[in-house]
Swiss-Prot record:
Function: Catalyzes the synthesis of GMP from XMP.
Active-site annotation: C86, H182, E184
Species lineage: Bacteria, Pseudomonadati, Pseudomonadota, Gammaproteobacteria, Oceanospirillales
UniProt GO molecular function: ATP binding; GMP synthase activity
Any one GO cellular component localisation term in the record: cytosol
Gene: guaA
Protein's name according to its UniProt entry: GMP synthase [glutamine-hydrolyzing]
Amino acid sequence: MSENIHSHRILILDFGSQYTQLIARRVREIGVYCEIYPFDMSEADIREFNPKGVILAGGPESVTELGSPRAPECLFNMDLPLLGICYGMQTMAEQMGGKVAGSNVREFGYAQVKIERSEDGLFENIKDHVAEDGKPLLDVWMSHGDKVVALPEGFVISASTPSAPIAAMQHESKPWFGVQFHPEVTHTLQGRRMLERFLVNICGCKQLWTPGRIIEDAITQVRNQVGQDKVLLGLSGGVDSSVVAALLHRAIGDQLTCVFVDNGLLRLHEGDQVMDMFAKNMGIKVVRANAQDQFLSKLAGENDPERKRKIIGHTFIEVFDAEAAKIKDVKWLAQGTIYPDVIESAAAKTGKAHVIKSHHNVGGLPEDMEMQLVEPLRELFKDEVRKIGLELGLPYDMVYRHPFPGPGLGVRILGEVKKEYADILREADAIFIEELHRAELYHKVSQAFAVFLPVKSVGVVGDARRYEYVIALRAVETIDFMTARWAHLPYELLEKISNRIINEISGVSRVVYDVSSKPPATIEWE
Protein backbone atom coordinates (compact mmCIF):
# COMPACT_ATOMS: atom_id res chain seq x y z
CA MET A 1 0.00 0.00 0.00
CA SER A 2 1.55 3.33 -1.05
CA GLU A 3 1.84 6.09 1.52
CA ASN A 4 -1.07 8.52 1.94
CA ILE A 5 -0.10 11.64 -0.03
CA HIS A 6 -1.85 13.86 2.54
CA SER A 7 0.01 12.39 5.53
CA HIS A 8 3.07 14.65 5.29
CA ARG A 9 1.30 17.99 5.43
CA ILE A 10 2.04 21.60 6.21
CA LEU A 11 -0.38 24.08 7.77
CA ILE A 12 -0.30 27.64 6.41
CA LEU A 13 -1.97 30.23 8.63
CA ASP A 14 -3.27 33.22 6.68
CA PHE A 15 -3.03 36.76 8.05
CA GLY A 16 -4.53 38.30 4.90
CA SER A 17 -1.48 38.54 2.62
CA GLN A 18 -1.88 38.62 -1.15
CA TYR A 19 1.00 36.11 -1.23
CA THR A 20 -0.58 33.36 0.94
CA GLN A 21 -1.82 31.25 -1.98
CA LEU A 22 1.56 31.68 -3.66
CA ILE A 23 3.27 30.22 -0.55
CA ALA A 24 0.92 27.21 -0.75
CA ARG A 25 1.68 26.74 -4.45
CA ARG A 26 5.43 26.84 -3.80
CA VAL A 27 5.11 24.27 -0.98
CA ARG A 28 3.20 21.95 -3.29
CA GLU A 29 5.66 22.45 -6.17
CA ILE A 30 8.30 21.08 -3.80
CA GLY A 31 6.09 17.98 -3.43
CA VAL A 32 4.49 18.58 -0.04
CA TYR A 33 0.73 18.83 0.59
CA CYS A 34 -0.50 21.91 2.47
CA GLU A 35 -3.72 23.72 3.30
CA ILE A 36 -4.51 27.34 4.15
CA TYR A 37 -6.51 28.20 7.28
CA PRO A 38 -7.27 31.49 9.03
CA PHE A 39 -4.78 32.75 11.64
CA ASP A 40 -7.21 32.16 14.55
CA MET A 41 -7.53 28.40 13.99
CA SER A 42 -8.30 26.60 17.25
CA GLU A 43 -5.83 24.32 19.02
CA ALA A 44 -8.23 21.37 18.59
CA ASP A 45 -8.38 21.96 14.81
CA ILE A 46 -4.58 22.29 14.57
CA ARG A 47 -4.10 19.01 16.45
CA GLU A 48 -6.71 17.30 14.26
CA PHE A 49 -5.00 18.60 11.11
CA ASN A 50 -1.75 17.14 12.49
CA PRO A 51 0.81 19.09 10.43
CA LYS A 52 4.52 18.32 10.18
CA GLY A 53 5.18 22.06 10.38
CA VAL A 54 3.45 25.44 10.29
CA ILE A 55 4.06 28.50 8.11
CA LEU A 56 2.84 31.85 9.43
CA ALA A 57 2.16 33.87 6.27
CA GLY A 58 2.34 37.62 5.76
CA GLY A 59 -0.41 40.16 6.22
CA PRO A 60 -1.24 43.82 5.56
CA GLU A 61 -1.66 44.91 9.19
CA SER A 62 0.86 46.14 11.75
CA VAL A 63 1.81 44.04 14.77
CA THR A 64 2.21 47.32 16.68
CA GLU A 65 -1.52 48.13 16.38
CA LEU A 66 -3.99 47.07 19.04
CA GLY A 67 -6.20 44.17 17.92
CA SER A 68 -4.00 43.14 14.97
CA PRO A 69 -4.00 39.38 14.24
CA ARG A 70 -1.90 37.01 16.34
CA ALA A 71 -0.80 33.40 15.80
CA PRO A 72 -2.46 30.77 18.04
CA GLU A 73 -0.45 30.73 21.32
CA CYS A 74 -0.64 26.91 21.39
CA LEU A 75 1.86 26.76 18.49
CA PHE A 76 4.67 27.80 20.82
CA ASN A 77 4.01 24.80 23.08
CA MET A 78 3.59 22.09 20.43
CA ASP A 79 7.18 21.32 19.38
CA LEU A 80 6.24 21.90 15.73
CA PRO A 81 8.69 23.50 13.28
CA LEU A 82 7.56 27.09 12.59
CA LEU A 83 8.43 29.46 9.74
CA GLY A 84 7.24 33.06 10.04
CA ILE A 85 7.27 35.06 6.79
CA CYS A 86 7.14 38.90 6.98
CA TYR A 87 4.15 39.65 9.27
CA GLY A 88 4.39 36.01 10.42
CA MET A 89 7.95 36.63 11.67
CA GLN A 90 6.91 39.87 13.37
CA THR A 91 3.96 38.39 15.28
CA MET A 92 6.10 35.40 16.25
CA ALA A 93 8.82 37.72 17.63
CA GLU A 94 6.31 39.91 19.47
CA GLN A 95 4.33 36.99 20.96
CA MET A 96 7.51 35.38 22.28
CA GLY A 97 8.79 38.50 24.03
CA GLY A 98 10.70 40.30 21.28
CA LYS A 99 9.94 43.80 20.05
CA VAL A 100 8.56 45.09 16.75
CA ALA A 101 8.61 48.76 15.74
CA GLY A 102 7.53 50.82 12.77
CA SER A 103 10.47 51.53 10.47
CA ASN A 104 11.26 54.96 9.09
CA VAL A 105 12.51 53.16 5.97
CA ARG A 106 9.88 51.04 4.21
CA GLU A 107 11.63 48.21 2.42
CA PHE A 108 9.73 47.34 -0.72
CA GLY A 109 11.18 45.46 -3.66
CA TYR A 110 14.62 44.02 -4.32
CA ALA A 111 17.10 43.85 -1.42
CA GLN A 112 20.29 42.03 -0.50
CA VAL A 113 20.54 40.25 2.84
CA LYS A 114 23.76 39.14 4.47
CA ILE A 115 23.72 35.66 6.02
CA GLU A 116 24.91 35.88 9.63
CA ARG A 117 24.31 32.21 10.45
CA SER A 118 23.95 29.47 7.85
CA GLU A 119 24.51 26.21 9.73
CA ASP A 120 21.50 24.09 10.83
CA GLY A 121 18.98 26.57 9.40
CA LEU A 122 17.24 27.78 6.25
CA PHE A 123 20.40 29.14 4.64
CA GLU A 124 22.78 26.19 4.80
CA ASN A 125 24.87 26.02 1.58
CA ILE A 126 22.76 28.76 -0.02
CA LYS A 127 24.16 31.99 -1.49
CA ASP A 128 23.91 34.32 -4.50
CA HIS A 129 27.04 36.43 -3.89
CA VAL A 130 29.80 36.84 -1.32
CA ALA A 131 30.27 40.03 0.74
CA GLU A 132 33.64 41.69 1.32
CA ASP A 133 33.82 40.09 4.77
CA GLY A 134 33.35 36.65 3.18
CA LYS A 135 29.75 36.17 4.34
CA PRO A 136 27.14 34.91 1.84
CA LEU A 137 24.68 37.41 0.31
CA LEU A 138 21.18 36.59 -0.96
CA ASP A 139 19.02 38.50 -3.45
CA VAL A 140 15.54 38.71 -1.91
CA TRP A 141 12.18 40.49 -2.22
CA MET A 142 11.06 42.68 0.67
CA SER A 143 7.64 44.17 1.34
CA HIS A 144 7.35 45.58 4.86
CA GLY A 145 7.06 48.73 6.96
CA ASP A 146 7.58 47.31 10.47
CA LYS A 147 10.64 45.38 11.60
CA VAL A 148 11.82 43.29 14.53
CA VAL A 149 14.08 45.50 16.69
CA ALA A 150 14.69 43.16 19.65
CA LEU A 151 14.96 39.36 19.48
CA PRO A 152 12.84 37.10 21.68
CA GLU A 153 14.76 35.03 24.23
CA GLY A 154 16.57 32.05 22.71
CA PHE A 155 16.72 33.53 19.18
CA VAL A 156 19.74 34.62 17.16
CA ILE A 157 20.05 36.78 14.04
CA SER A 158 20.49 34.67 10.89
CA ALA A 159 20.37 37.44 8.23
CA SER A 160 20.55 41.24 8.15
CA THR A 161 20.28 44.28 5.88
CA PRO A 162 21.57 47.79 6.64
CA SER A 163 18.04 49.06 7.36
CA ALA A 164 16.74 45.85 9.04
CA PRO A 165 19.51 44.37 11.23
CA ILE A 166 17.16 41.47 12.09
CA ALA A 167 16.13 40.42 8.55
CA ALA A 168 15.90 36.75 9.60
CA MET A 169 16.06 34.95 12.93
CA GLN A 170 16.16 31.41 14.26
CA HIS A 171 15.86 29.77 17.67
CA GLU A 172 19.05 28.28 19.07
CA SER A 173 17.50 24.95 20.04
CA LYS A 174 13.98 24.74 18.58
CA PRO A 175 13.09 24.46 14.84
CA TRP A 176 11.65 28.00 14.75
CA PHE A 177 12.57 30.44 11.98
CA GLY A 178 11.51 33.88 10.81
CA VAL A 179 12.32 35.77 7.60
CA GLN A 180 11.41 39.39 6.91
CA PHE A 181 11.54 38.83 3.13
CA HIS A 182 9.34 36.69 0.85
CA PRO A 183 10.94 33.35 -0.14
CA GLU A 184 7.81 32.42 -2.13
CA VAL A 185 8.25 35.07 -4.86
CA THR A 186 10.58 34.39 -7.78
CA HIS A 187 12.55 37.62 -7.11
CA THR A 188 14.00 35.84 -4.05
CA LEU A 189 16.33 33.76 -6.19
CA GLN A 190 17.04 31.00 -3.65
CA GLY A 191 13.53 31.08 -2.16
CA ARG A 192 12.63 27.60 -3.34
CA ARG A 193 15.77 26.13 -1.77
CA MET A 194 15.00 27.85 1.55
CA LEU A 195 11.46 26.49 1.56
CA GLU A 196 12.73 23.05 0.58
CA ARG A 197 15.18 23.11 3.49
CA PHE A 198 12.34 23.99 5.85
CA LEU A 199 9.92 21.38 4.47
CA VAL A 200 12.26 18.46 3.85
CA ASN A 201 15.25 18.90 6.18
CA ILE A 202 13.61 20.66 9.13
CA CYS A 203 9.99 19.38 9.08
CA GLY A 204 11.03 15.96 7.73
CA CYS A 205 8.33 15.90 5.05
CA LYS A 206 8.49 13.30 2.30
CA GLN A 207 7.86 14.70 -1.19
CA LEU A 208 4.75 12.63 -1.88
CA TRP A 209 2.67 15.31 -3.63
CA THR A 210 3.34 14.58 -7.33
CA PRO A 211 0.99 14.58 -10.36
CA GLY A 212 1.08 10.78 -10.72
CA ARG A 213 0.26 10.19 -7.06
CA ILE A 214 -2.42 12.91 -7.03
CA ILE A 215 -4.15 11.14 -9.95
CA GLU A 216 -3.95 7.74 -8.22
CA ASP A 217 -5.35 9.24 -5.03
CA ALA A 218 -8.18 11.05 -6.88
CA ILE A 219 -9.14 7.87 -8.76
CA THR A 220 -9.34 5.89 -5.50
CA GLN A 221 -11.41 8.63 -3.86
CA VAL A 222 -13.83 8.93 -6.79
CA ARG A 223 -14.35 5.15 -6.95
CA ASN A 224 -15.01 5.02 -3.20
CA GLN A 225 -17.34 8.00 -3.40
CA VAL A 226 -19.56 7.07 -6.36
CA GLY A 227 -19.35 3.26 -6.37
CA GLN A 228 -21.28 1.95 -9.38
CA ASP A 229 -23.45 5.10 -9.74
CA LYS A 230 -23.71 7.24 -12.87
CA VAL A 231 -22.00 10.65 -12.95
CA LEU A 232 -22.90 13.68 -15.06
CA LEU A 233 -20.44 16.44 -16.02
CA GLY A 234 -21.02 19.73 -17.81
CA LEU A 235 -18.10 19.85 -20.26
CA SER A 236 -17.14 23.32 -21.48
CA GLY A 237 -13.83 22.62 -23.20
CA GLY A 238 -12.06 24.75 -20.56
CA VAL A 239 -9.09 23.39 -18.61
CA ASP A 240 -10.88 22.46 -15.38
CA SER A 241 -13.83 20.57 -16.87
CA SER A 242 -11.55 18.88 -19.44
CA VAL A 243 -9.25 17.57 -16.70
CA VAL A 244 -12.26 16.42 -14.64
CA ALA A 245 -13.58 14.55 -17.71
CA ALA A 246 -10.25 12.81 -18.35
CA LEU A 247 -9.79 11.96 -14.66
CA LEU A 248 -13.33 10.62 -14.14
CA HIS A 249 -13.17 8.62 -17.36
CA ARG A 250 -9.99 6.96 -16.13
CA ALA A 251 -11.62 6.30 -12.73
CA ILE A 252 -15.12 5.12 -13.70
CA GLY A 253 -15.20 4.71 -17.49
CA ASP A 254 -18.72 4.52 -18.93
CA GLN A 255 -20.40 5.53 -15.67
CA LEU A 256 -19.55 9.08 -16.80
CA THR A 257 -21.69 11.05 -19.25
CA CYS A 258 -20.67 14.56 -20.29
CA VAL A 259 -23.09 17.20 -21.54
CA PHE A 260 -21.51 19.78 -23.82
CA VAL A 261 -23.73 22.83 -24.32
CA ASP A 262 -22.91 24.67 -27.57
CA ASN A 263 -24.28 28.16 -26.94
CA GLY A 264 -23.18 29.72 -30.23
CA LEU A 265 -20.71 31.91 -28.32
CA LEU A 266 -17.68 29.61 -28.53
CA ARG A 267 -14.41 30.14 -30.39
CA LEU A 268 -13.98 29.05 -34.02
CA HIS A 269 -14.56 25.26 -34.42
CA GLU A 270 -14.44 24.85 -30.63
CA GLY A 271 -17.53 22.64 -30.45
CA ASP A 272 -16.14 20.23 -33.04
CA GLN A 273 -12.73 20.20 -31.33
CA VAL A 274 -14.30 19.26 -27.99
CA MET A 275 -16.28 16.43 -29.59
CA ASP A 276 -13.21 15.15 -31.49
CA MET A 277 -11.01 15.24 -28.41
CA PHE A 278 -13.32 13.66 -25.87
CA ALA A 279 -15.87 11.59 -27.78
CA LYS A 280 -13.77 10.45 -30.73
CA ASN A 281 -10.21 10.22 -29.35
CA MET A 282 -10.86 9.35 -25.70
CA GLY A 283 -14.07 7.38 -26.08
CA ILE A 284 -15.97 9.40 -23.46
CA LYS A 285 -19.77 9.55 -23.70
CA VAL A 286 -20.50 13.18 -24.67
CA VAL A 287 -23.95 14.55 -25.45
CA ARG A 288 -23.78 17.72 -27.55
CA ALA A 289 -26.67 20.12 -27.06
CA ASN A 290 -26.82 22.49 -30.02
CA ALA A 291 -28.56 25.42 -28.38
CA GLN A 292 -27.20 28.35 -30.39
CA ASP A 293 -30.64 29.60 -31.46
CA GLN A 294 -32.01 29.37 -27.91
CA PHE A 295 -29.18 31.50 -26.50
CA LEU A 296 -29.21 34.08 -29.30
CA SER A 297 -32.98 34.57 -29.19
CA LYS A 298 -32.89 35.17 -25.41
CA LEU A 299 -30.04 37.66 -25.81
CA ALA A 300 -31.79 39.62 -28.58
CA GLY A 301 -32.16 43.29 -27.69
CA GLU A 302 -30.14 43.06 -24.46
CA ASN A 303 -27.27 45.55 -24.06
CA ASP A 304 -26.46 45.40 -20.34
CA PRO A 305 -23.36 43.25 -19.59
CA GLU A 306 -24.61 41.95 -16.23
CA ARG A 307 -28.00 40.99 -17.63
CA LYS A 308 -26.30 39.29 -20.59
CA ARG A 309 -24.23 37.19 -18.15
CA LYS A 310 -27.37 36.23 -16.20
CA ILE A 311 -29.31 35.30 -19.35
CA ILE A 312 -26.42 33.12 -20.57
CA GLY A 313 -26.12 31.49 -17.11
CA HIS A 314 -29.85 30.77 -16.75
CA THR A 315 -30.15 29.49 -20.32
CA PHE A 316 -27.18 27.18 -19.75
CA ILE A 317 -28.93 25.67 -16.72
CA GLU A 318 -32.20 25.23 -18.67
CA VAL A 319 -30.42 23.45 -21.53
CA PHE A 320 -28.23 21.38 -19.19
CA ASP A 321 -31.25 20.37 -17.08
CA ALA A 322 -33.21 19.31 -20.15
CA GLU A 323 -30.33 17.10 -21.31
CA ALA A 324 -29.72 15.75 -17.79
CA ALA A 325 -33.38 14.75 -17.48
CA LYS A 326 -32.98 12.45 -20.50
CA ILE A 327 -30.24 10.45 -18.74
CA LYS A 328 -31.77 8.06 -16.23
CA ASP A 329 -30.54 7.21 -12.71
CA VAL A 330 -27.78 9.80 -12.43
CA LYS A 331 -26.79 10.22 -8.77
CA TRP A 332 -23.75 12.48 -9.03
CA LEU A 333 -22.93 15.81 -10.64
CA ALA A 334 -19.21 16.44 -11.27
CA GLN A 335 -17.79 19.94 -11.12
CA GLY A 336 -14.41 21.49 -11.88
CA THR A 337 -14.20 23.37 -8.56
CA ILE A 338 -10.56 24.12 -7.70
CA TYR A 339 -8.89 25.15 -4.41
CA PRO A 340 -8.94 28.96 -4.98
CA ASP A 341 -12.75 28.70 -5.54
CA VAL A 342 -13.04 26.95 -2.18
CA ILE A 343 -10.90 29.57 -0.42
CA GLU A 344 -12.79 32.48 -2.01
CA SER A 345 -16.20 30.97 -1.33
CA ALA A 346 -15.29 30.44 2.34
CA ALA A 347 -13.77 33.92 2.59
CA ALA A 348 -16.97 35.43 1.20
CA LYS A 349 -19.00 33.65 3.90
CA THR A 350 -16.68 34.18 6.88
CA GLY A 351 -14.46 37.06 5.87
CA LYS A 352 -11.41 34.79 5.82
CA ALA A 353 -9.97 31.82 3.98
CA HIS A 354 -11.30 28.56 5.34
CA VAL A 355 -11.44 24.84 5.10
CA ILE A 356 -11.20 22.53 2.08
CA LYS A 357 -13.74 20.05 3.35
CA SER A 358 -16.64 22.45 3.92
CA HIS A 359 -19.29 21.86 1.25
CA HIS A 360 -18.73 24.22 -1.62
CA ASN A 361 -21.25 24.76 -4.38
CA VAL A 362 -19.98 27.08 -7.06
CA GLY A 363 -23.44 28.56 -7.44
CA GLY A 364 -25.84 28.69 -10.33
CA LEU A 365 -27.15 25.17 -9.75
CA PRO A 366 -30.89 24.72 -9.29
CA GLU A 367 -31.95 24.24 -5.67
CA ASP A 368 -34.04 21.14 -6.41
CA MET A 369 -31.26 19.24 -8.19
CA GLU A 370 -31.26 15.85 -6.49
CA MET A 371 -27.66 15.00 -7.23
CA GLN A 372 -24.65 14.94 -4.96
CA LEU A 373 -21.47 16.74 -5.96
CA VAL A 374 -18.21 15.07 -6.91
CA GLU A 375 -15.33 17.56 -7.16
CA PRO A 376 -12.05 15.73 -7.79
CA LEU A 377 -10.00 18.96 -8.24
CA ARG A 378 -11.16 20.83 -5.14
CA GLU A 379 -7.77 20.46 -3.41
CA LEU A 380 -5.77 21.69 -6.41
CA PHE A 381 -4.44 25.00 -7.66
CA LYS A 382 -4.74 25.84 -11.37
CA ASP A 383 -1.07 25.07 -12.11
CA GLU A 384 -1.53 21.63 -10.49
CA VAL A 385 -4.66 21.01 -12.57
CA ARG A 386 -2.66 21.72 -15.74
CA LYS A 387 0.14 19.32 -14.71
CA ILE A 388 -2.42 16.61 -14.02
CA GLY A 389 -4.05 17.26 -17.40
CA LEU A 390 -0.72 16.64 -19.14
CA GLU A 391 -0.13 13.51 -17.05
CA LEU A 392 -3.59 12.25 -18.13
CA GLY A 393 -2.61 12.68 -21.79
CA LEU A 394 -4.45 15.89 -22.68
CA PRO A 395 -2.64 17.95 -25.36
CA TYR A 396 -0.36 20.79 -24.16
CA ASP A 397 -2.20 23.40 -26.25
CA MET A 398 -5.51 22.47 -24.65
CA VAL A 399 -4.17 22.40 -21.09
CA TYR A 400 -2.28 25.69 -21.46
CA ARG A 401 -4.96 27.47 -23.47
CA HIS A 402 -5.69 31.02 -22.36
CA PRO A 403 -8.65 31.58 -20.01
CA PHE A 404 -12.03 31.99 -21.71
CA PRO A 405 -14.95 33.59 -19.86
CA GLY A 406 -17.97 31.47 -18.93
CA PRO A 407 -20.35 33.59 -21.06
CA GLY A 408 -17.91 33.18 -23.96
CA LEU A 409 -18.05 35.69 -26.80
CA GLY A 410 -21.19 37.10 -25.16
CA VAL A 411 -19.00 39.45 -23.10
CA ARG A 412 -16.56 40.14 -25.94
CA ILE A 413 -19.31 41.56 -28.15
CA LEU A 414 -20.06 44.97 -26.66
CA GLY A 415 -23.78 45.61 -26.31
CA GLU A 416 -26.33 43.41 -28.06
CA VAL A 417 -25.22 39.94 -29.18
CA LYS A 418 -26.15 38.98 -32.76
CA LYS A 419 -25.16 35.93 -34.80
CA GLU A 420 -23.52 38.18 -37.43
CA TYR A 421 -21.35 39.81 -34.73
CA ALA A 422 -20.39 36.46 -33.20
CA ASP A 423 -19.38 35.08 -36.61
CA ILE A 424 -17.17 38.11 -37.37
CA LEU A 425 -15.58 38.00 -33.91
CA ARG A 426 -14.87 34.26 -34.10
CA GLU A 427 -12.95 34.72 -37.36
CA ALA A 428 -11.00 37.74 -36.08
CA ASP A 429 -10.09 36.01 -32.82
CA ALA A 430 -8.90 32.91 -34.70
CA ILE A 431 -6.58 35.00 -36.92
CA PHE A 432 -5.14 36.79 -33.86
CA ILE A 433 -4.46 33.53 -32.00
CA GLU A 434 -3.09 31.79 -35.10
CA GLU A 435 -0.56 34.59 -35.68
CA LEU A 436 0.48 34.61 -32.01
CA HIS A 437 1.19 30.88 -32.27
CA ARG A 438 3.08 31.38 -35.52
CA ALA A 439 5.24 34.09 -33.89
CA GLU A 440 5.77 31.78 -30.88
CA LEU A 441 4.27 34.42 -28.59
CA TYR A 442 1.01 32.70 -27.58
CA HIS A 443 2.45 31.06 -24.46
CA LYS A 444 4.48 34.18 -23.62
CA VAL A 445 1.34 36.27 -23.07
CA SER A 446 -1.14 35.35 -20.36
CA GLN A 447 -4.32 36.05 -22.30
CA ALA A 448 -5.11 37.30 -25.78
CA PHE A 449 -8.42 37.79 -27.58
CA ALA A 450 -10.39 39.97 -29.97
CA VAL A 451 -13.35 42.19 -29.03
CA PHE A 452 -16.21 43.19 -31.35
CA LEU A 453 -17.14 46.89 -31.23
CA PRO A 454 -20.63 47.52 -32.63
CA VAL A 455 -19.66 50.90 -34.06
CA LYS A 456 -19.12 51.54 -37.74
CA SER A 457 -15.98 53.30 -38.87
CA VAL A 458 -15.24 54.63 -42.32
CA GLY A 459 -12.85 52.71 -44.54
CA VAL A 460 -11.79 52.97 -48.18
CA VAL A 461 -11.78 50.03 -50.59
CA GLY A 462 -10.66 50.93 -54.09
CA ASP A 463 -12.34 54.29 -54.68
CA ALA A 464 -15.36 53.52 -52.53
CA ARG A 465 -15.90 54.55 -48.91
CA ARG A 466 -17.48 51.92 -46.69
CA TYR A 467 -18.73 51.97 -43.11
CA GLU A 468 -17.89 48.76 -41.30
CA TYR A 469 -17.25 47.39 -37.82
CA VAL A 470 -14.21 47.76 -35.56
CA ILE A 471 -12.25 44.92 -33.93
CA ALA A 472 -10.14 45.58 -30.83
CA LEU A 473 -7.26 43.27 -29.96
CA ARG A 474 -6.31 42.69 -26.31
CA ALA A 475 -3.21 40.88 -25.02
CA VAL A 476 -1.96 41.04 -21.44
CA GLU A 477 0.87 39.73 -19.28
CA THR A 478 0.10 38.84 -15.68
CA ILE A 479 1.09 36.45 -12.92
CA ASP A 480 -2.17 36.32 -10.96
CA PHE A 481 -4.80 38.13 -13.13
CA MET A 482 -5.29 40.59 -10.22
CA THR A 483 -3.04 43.09 -11.98
CA ALA A 484 -1.94 42.96 -15.61
CA ARG A 485 0.05 45.02 -18.11
CA TRP A 486 -0.73 45.20 -21.79
CA ALA A 487 1.57 43.00 -23.85
CA HIS A 488 4.10 44.93 -25.94
CA LEU A 489 3.64 42.92 -29.14
CA PRO A 490 5.90 43.77 -32.11
CA TYR A 491 4.42 46.40 -34.45
CA GLU A 492 5.13 44.18 -37.47
CA LEU A 493 3.02 41.42 -35.93
CA LEU A 494 0.15 43.78 -35.11
CA GLU A 495 0.29 45.11 -38.67
CA LYS A 496 0.13 41.59 -40.10
CA ILE A 497 -2.82 40.63 -37.87
CA SER A 498 -4.67 43.85 -38.72
CA ASN A 499 -4.15 43.39 -42.47
CA ARG A 500 -5.37 39.79 -42.33
CA ILE A 501 -8.50 40.64 -40.32
CA ILE A 502 -9.48 43.56 -42.58
CA ASN A 503 -8.73 41.68 -45.82
CA GLU A 504 -10.11 38.26 -44.89
CA ILE A 505 -13.26 39.17 -42.94
CA SER A 506 -16.02 41.08 -44.66
CA GLY A 507 -17.64 43.64 -42.40
CA VAL A 508 -14.49 44.91 -40.65
CA SER A 509 -12.80 48.17 -41.68
CA ARG A 510 -10.59 48.95 -38.69
CA VAL A 511 -8.48 47.11 -36.07
CA VAL A 512 -7.26 48.77 -32.85
CA TYR A 513 -4.94 47.51 -30.09
CA ASP A 514 -5.87 47.98 -26.43
CA VAL A 515 -2.99 49.51 -24.43
CA SER A 516 -4.75 49.71 -21.04
CA SER A 517 -3.32 48.01 -17.97
CA LYS A 518 -5.26 46.54 -15.04
CA PRO A 519 -5.98 48.53 -12.94
CA PRO A 520 -7.64 50.80 -13.94
CA ALA A 521 -9.03 48.79 -16.87
CA THR A 522 -10.23 45.20 -16.42
CA ILE A 523 -8.85 42.47 -18.68
CA GLU A 524 -12.20 41.73 -20.36
CA TRP A 525 -14.09 44.66 -21.86
CA GLU A 526 -17.43 43.76 -20.27
